[in-house]
Amino acid sequence: MAIKAEEISALLRSQIENYESEMSVTDVGTVLQIGDGIALIHGLNDVMAGELVEFHNGVLGLAQNLEESNVGVVILGPYTGITEGDEVKRTGRIMEVPVGEELIGRVVNPLGQPIDGQGPINTTKTRPVEKKATGVMDRKSVDEPLQTGIKAIDALVPIGRGQRELIIGDRQTGKTTIAIDTILNQKDQGTICIYVAIGQKDSTVRANVEKLRQAGALDYTIVVAASASEPSPLLYIAPYSGVTMGEEFMFNGKHVLIVYDDLTKQAAAYRELSLLLRRPPGREAYPGDVFYLHSRLLERAAKLNDDLGGGSITALPIIETQAGDISAYVPTNVISITDGQIFLQSDLFFSGVRPAINAGQSVSRVGGSAQIKAMKKVAGTLRLDLASYRELESFAQFGSDLDEFTASKLERGKRTVEVLKQDQNKPLPVEHQVLIIYALTKGYLDDIPVVDITRFEDELNHWAESNATELLNEIRETGGLPDAEKFDTAINEFKKSFSKSE
């Protein structure tokens, strides 16, 4: 049989073309020391800051301290299977998390892996966790309202899309409740919500997820959970993972609301990491860059200009104080970074004023320009009225013989406090808020006993739904304040049918 040279060369050519070299060159190091979620690695001379490295058992680590003789790596997972002398490989990748629509309705860990038992997440797109914040020229000033559904906030400390508004207060004062209520109020508003739970009990996270599911809010919400039992590197990374998922939507022209619950625990996790990495401690044993830890996170919340699609990320960071001390290190840092704060007071909470917002110390530095005209007009004097009531209240304790003007101020103040009370998980549409605040400021509640105020409001809302729909629709659709005559007619009509308690 004759051997044909063409056939042999064609065969060889196809073999060469299909040949795949299995050999790859990777930078390899050795574990010198391991413990408390930190590994010291020798030999990774070319590793980048923030690069992922892979241990022999598949667990990933994050390169943090780049020193002459070794690299300090924080381990993103269980470290019990890693021992001294183990091999460590560079991956050449910085940390990334999956992003996209597929994450909506899911509960994931800070690495973007599902932890809700509902199967894998089929997304192919990823984004780097650490990213420079949007530049000044790509932004636009805050001018669209983000309605929380909470009267005391929408009237006194309004929030706009693209704003960073801090929620600060002692433990058990209703901080998470405000955040969850705000998420519930975004239903049908076209806002995607991201709830980042940092260092909370698993049972607490589960309860919040169930609350969102029952209200139908998981249809537009992503939950990123790093519970108290997770290693501290995951608690440190969780907020950055959350905002990275949010940026994907923002750059596609959508509106995002992100809640960090809470950044005090993230700062504590970062302090733990820094001390284990032998970085020099500063005030309250925090490292020197704890301000940068939060500023680079919160600066990623923005309102993009119209050329970039006009998307936004609104951030609601939560900070827990000790005994109301807002002058501690982390609270003062975050207050200076954000565009205002909602200060919750335990004294108010325990006296039955819920949400326990201290109107005097709560501010919104940019939200005023985003507030709808109707609310701005009816709630204009509300803060001053509340402040003068608090002042008169303490003054009135010393004597009962008050002049008529002071007595009327006190009575109006009591009704103002009652109107601003609200049950949890019951956000109120803005048109109903405008209606009750108008009734309050125009004196329609002055002859209603204080004990009846809540019932008056509930019944007014039900009555208005069927008898004053035009009025409510006008506020909802235009944002402007209808004629006073329409309000007066509606409220007077309702008062005829309202029965006061004896």
UniProtKB/Swiss-Prot annotation:
This is ATP synthase subunit alpha. GO terms for molecular function: ADP binding; ATP binding; proton-transporting ATP synthase activity, rotational mechanism. Its main location: membrane. It is a peripheral membrane protein. F-type ATPases have 2 components, CF(1) - the catalytic core - and CF(0) - the membrane proton channel. CF(1) has five subunits: alpha(3), beta(3), gamma(1), delta(1), epsilon(1). CF(0) has three main subunits: a(1), b(2) and c(9-12). The alpha and beta chains form an alternating ring which encloses part of the gamma chain. CF(1) is attached to CF(0) by a central stalk formed by the gamma and epsilon chains, while a peripheral stalk is formed by the delta and b chains. The keyword Ribosomal protein does not apply. It catalyses: ATP + H2O + 4 H(+)(in) = ADP + phosphate + 5 H(+)(out). One of its GO terms (cellular component) is plasma membrane. It comes from Staphylococcus aureus (strain NCTC 8325 / PS 47). The gene is atpA.
